[in-house]
Regions:
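Transmembrane alpha-helical segments that form the functional core of multipass membrane systems
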Residues: 255-363
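Membrane-embedded alpha-helical signal segments
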Residues: 1-289, 297, 303-304
Length: 363
């Protein structure tokens, strides 16, 4: 069989231990299965083998399409005639069946993926929201989004990037809400990529799609590990990009205001959510400018405005009680936000550093 000979020459059968070639007989015809060990469901393969062993010579149809319809008891089945597609499917974990006398290949998607359970992300926690998060398996991530939007306008287009890795990429959007010009721009940028592989998954894709200028520190994408946040952005007309082997979604377009938003802002009443947004914006600004401004005022005390004179190192000054409460409330909110968004692996070293800094300041 020419097809089997070509597959044996192209694939490293016998060299790669996980690349399996299984020769069987179906209806008194020679047949060969190609698949990757570790990707195949054993139960599904047993059912397929039982079905194949029961096919008689008289029951063999003339074409591969008819055989797939009559004798392949599985849902995801395709008939391929292009060898590039066959090789790509085999290396992706799909089981490919060649039968003597058929010019086409029968691709049976019996894949199963090693994946961790769905759990809440460490750095994007919510007080009142759902407790699920994206994982490294792309089909699980699309299912989490489909569960929340049961609408025919939700489109998920599959493509790939990387000449060697051939990493799966899914472009998600609402066809009745998305900006068509933005969508066309995103598709053209992904299709025009000429890279060997996505070493760092989404970060590599982001850098390849939009070349960042050195003088612009702001990101082009917003990343989230929460399906509810991604779905909310879809309903706003934005585009979501999912990359296989990455537990987060890329959101675009984005702005500076999107970076300070969190899921908690929408799980509380409007007034509370607005307060959280304003507090986060103030804390973000203070994080960037408070240290240099404080140093500037300490070196030039005459520049301190009258309303902030209590910050200067002088004798005892009575700070207005209302101002004390406002500063205390803002500090508590800042600590709460830091506790919610700090990964568990960084919480201990940051606590030690904070204790040393506060102790040195007190002394």
């Amino acid at each position: 069989m020419e097809n089997i000979s070509y597959m044996d020459r192209t694939l490293p059968v016998g060299k790669s231990f996980d690349l399996i070639k299984r020769t069987i007989e179906i209806g008194e015809r020679k047949a060969v299965l190609y698949f990757i060990d570790g990707f195949v469901k054993d139960e599904a393969m047993l059912k397929l083998m039982d079905s194949f062993m029961g096919v008689t010579k008289e029951a063999m149809p003339k074409e591969a399409e008819m055989f797939s319809q009559r004798h392949v008891p599985y849902i995801e089945v395709d008939v391929l005639k292009d060898f590039d597609q066959v090789l790509r499917n085999v290396l992706s974990g799909v089981t490919c069946l060649f039968i003597e006398g058929y010019a086409a290949c029968i691709a049976i998607d019996t894949r199963t993926y090693p994946a961790r359970s769905v759990e809440e992300p460490d750095k994007d926690k919510s007080l009142r929201g759902s407790r699920d998060g994206f994982v490294e398996t792309i089909v699980f991530n699309t299912a989490l989004m489909r569960r929340r939007i049961r609408d025919e306008h939700l489109i998920m287009e599959m493509t790939e990037a990387g000449q060697t890795s051939r990493t799966d990429i899914v472009i998600c959007y609402m066809s009745d809400r998305v900006d068509k010009e933005l969508l066309a721009n995103v598709k053209s940028r992904i299709e025009s990529l000429h890279i060997d592989d996505l070493k760092m998954n989404q970060q590599t894709l982001a850098e390849a799609m939009f070349k960042r200028k050195w003088f612009n520190p702001f990101p082009k994408f917003k990343f989230t590990e929460r399906p509810d946040t991604a779905v909310a952005c879809l309903l706003e007309g934005k585009v979501i990009i999912l990359v296989d082997n990455s537990p987060s979604a890329m959101i675009l377009p984005t702005s500076i205001l999107d970076m300070i938003e969190e899921a908690n802002d929408y799980y509380f009443p409007t007034v509370t959510g607005m307060y959280l947004k304003v507090s986060r914006a103030i804390i973000t600004i203070l994080t960037v400018f408070m240290t240099p401004v404080y140093l500037l005022f300490m070196m030039n005390p005459s520049w301190i405005p009258s309303m902030f004179e209590f910050t200067a190192v002088r004798d005892v000054i009575n700070v207005p009680l209302v101002l004390q409460f406002l500063i205390l409330e803002l500090c508590i909110d800042g600590l709460r936000l830091a506790a919610l968004n700090t990964p568990s692996m960084l919480s201990t070293p940051l606590s030690v550093i904070a204790g040393l800094v506060l102790g040195e300041f007190a002394v």
